[in-house]
Amino acid sequence: MPYLTRQKFPVPLDRDQVAQDWRRRGYSCDAFTDPPGREWNNFVHTTNELVAVKGGRLKLTIDGEEIIAEPGDEVFIPKGVFHSVRNVSSSTTHWLYGYD
């Protein structure tokens, strides 16, 4: 399964629409707001994770592969895989995440 699905959701991204889609697929849906340069490094989870960018840009490193995610994109992070997330936007980035 590829990590990145470009333009999975229409922009502007609607959190309720994403939450409904993810619930149907067995995922939760929560939100993060990160300032420019914020990093979350070397995480690994026992569940699969989905990420969707609402506004801004994120650089995700998943098992050594770098991905730039933009508004409307969805990223799949498999369970048991090391990953990092960084706000590479010059402004605040708003993003959604969920676990199965």
Question: Can you say where each PLM-predicted feature lies in the sequence?
Answer:
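A short, N-terminal "cap"/entry segment at the start of jelly-roll beta-barrel domains
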Residues: M1-T33, N41
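Short histidine-centered beta-strand/loop micro-motifs
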Residues: A19-D21, E39-H45, R86-V88
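Short strand-coil-strand connectors
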Residues: R25, T61-E65
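A generic "binding-loop/recognition-motif" signal
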Residues: P36, T46, E65, V81-F82, ...
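Short, conserved beta-strand element in jelly-roll/cupin
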Residues: V44-L60
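Short acidic-glycine-tyrosine-enriched beta hairpin
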Residues: G64-K79
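Ligand-binding loop in jelly-roll beta-barrel domains
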Residues: K79-D100
